[in-house]
Amino acid sequence: MITKTYKDISEEKFYKLYFDLVNVLKPTDQITYTESLVLIEFLLLKEEKYKHARFAARAKREVIKILQEKYDKKVSMTYMAVILANLESKGWIEKEPDGIKYFNKKHQAVVDRILTSNDYEEIIFKLKVKQNNEH
């Protein structure tokens, strides 16, 4: 068995690890490096004003500013719209009937469980190799 324990990592580092793990499980629609940077910054916005407007114009402007300051990445509103459309088409962002966009609910449930736990949480991969008698 292979195990790896992460102790007291930042929320940002957690998201990076989580996206990397999910990419291992998904043969298609994997999140790219730039998409993950952008999505992480949206998810790190904690103010109440972003709770139900996580991907709205105000949040987009804030994330663009953060990307410039933190990574020296210049992202236009047009390019931001393309990145968010890609994340939506890949299932990372979901649009509710009321038109509001949210982080995928299944991923959010896993993330919330891990982020609010006082103990270690496990993410388990189970593998079974097909037995083939032919070479």
What are these regions (language model features)?
Residues M1-I9:
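General nucleic-acid-binding
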Residues D8-K51:
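Short alpha-helical segments that sit at the start of domains
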Residues K49-K70:
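Short acidic, hydrophobic short linear motifs in intrinsically disordered regions
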Residues D72-K90:
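Short amphipathic alpha-helical interaction segments
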Residues A85-K101:
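A short, conserved structural fragment
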Residues Q108-H135:
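Short, amphipathic alpha-helical interaction segments positioned at domain boundaries
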